[in-house]
Amino acid sequence: MTALSKSKEIIDQTSHYGANNYHPLPIVISEALGAWVKDPEGNEYMDMLSAYSAVNQGHRHPKIIQALKDQADKITLTSRAFHNDQLGPFYEKTAKLTGKEMILPMNTGAEAVESAVKAARRWAYEVKGVADNQAEIIACVGNFHGRTMLAVSLSSEEEYKRGFGPMLPGIKLIPYGDVEALRQAITPNTAAFLFEPIQGEAGIVIPPEGFLQEAAAICKEENVLFIADEIQTGLGRTGKTFACDWDGIVPDMYILGKALGGGVFPISCIAADREILGVFNPGSHGSTFGGNPLACAVSIASLEVLEDEKLADRSLELGEYFKSELESIDSPVIKEVRGRGLFIGVELTEAARPYCERLKEEGLLCKETHDTVIRFAPPLIISKEDLDWAIEKIKHVLRNA
């Protein structure tokens, strides 16, 4: 076997044994550091996806990796049958970051969404007084909250639902950004309005100005929980600690994941006050790995990196520069550039995938979303020099469309 065949061998092996539920670009990543990755042949590429914003702190950040190693040498898993010495510090760190009184830890973003809806439903029955089994959740058209049965039931994408029915009941969808539709959808049985402050998978869609403030006010007036899915937008990605900060709103509940584990270990959580998360009692919810000491130690280090290195400020500054450079590109295929911080979408007049493939050939890795949008979301630790390198590659590909 020659070195040149290694990537193809791995891709063939993956295709042969793996379920065909992904369509990745034809590249194998075998090593990474900071904003750069390598394939088995030693070719370097810039990562402009950050594992869908899970790698905000950069690949293999030394502080996070050290926390992983140190904790792995002590204990990795206890289950929640016993206390562990990392869970309390993780709770306190995350509670102070979010300004909430209680934290419930899980592993993946989709699990955290499930936990949020379970909490909202039980809150509706025990606190709001909704009749049993009548609680409703309102979500938005174009949302993405994961791939579990709840998440696909929340989705408006038929392809996500096809062949997986029946969907879960008690869900209503409104157009993203439509205040009147939200007002009309609320009934006495409404438990929560679940939203993304910026819709990522829909193509980096920013809500109309004033929508989130008005939605928050309506939910407060109607005694409906206002729940923000900040799994992808939170923790510095948009140039603020949370994307909700752009609109000056504080949700009743945050859903966090991805960068909470620094791109090193899966951990997610929901954060809310005692009135909401206090509805859980022993046995009502759980996870064997949720809140495990390894994940908690990694998460504490990941949050410290975000704070100590002021990555939200860095995202804001570099994001404004990056967006302005993208807007200056004279290309017949660019329809719109939108985004906040280092969370930017370039909408094209045609399919985006061929352009992602061309950018890969130029040494830059990104991914299409919603068919016609190229999503650019590099690690927040990226240097301006590296960003300038990427900008030149993007200009070259889009100008020569």
Curated annotation (Swiss-Prot):
Pathway annotation: Amino-acid biosynthesis; L-proline biosynthesis; L-glutamate 5-semialdehyde from L-ornithine: step 1/1
Regions that span the bilayer: none
Record note on disruption phenotype: Cells lacking this gene do not grow in minimal medium containing either arginine or ornithine as sole nitrogen source.
Induction: Part of the rocDEF operon. Expression is sigma L dependent, induced by arginine, ornithine, ctirulline or proline. Ammonium and glutamine strongly repress induction of the rocD by proline, and only glutamine represses weakly induction by arginine.
Signal peptide: none
Molecular-function GO terms, alphabetical: identical protein binding; ornithine aminotransferase activity; pyridoxal phosphate binding
Summary of the function given for this chain in its UniProt record: Catalyzes the interconversion of ornithine to glutamate semialdehyde.
Protein name: Ornithine aminotransferase
Species for this entry: Bacillus subtilis (strain 168)
Lineage: Bacteria, Bacillati, Bacillota, Bacilli, Bacillales
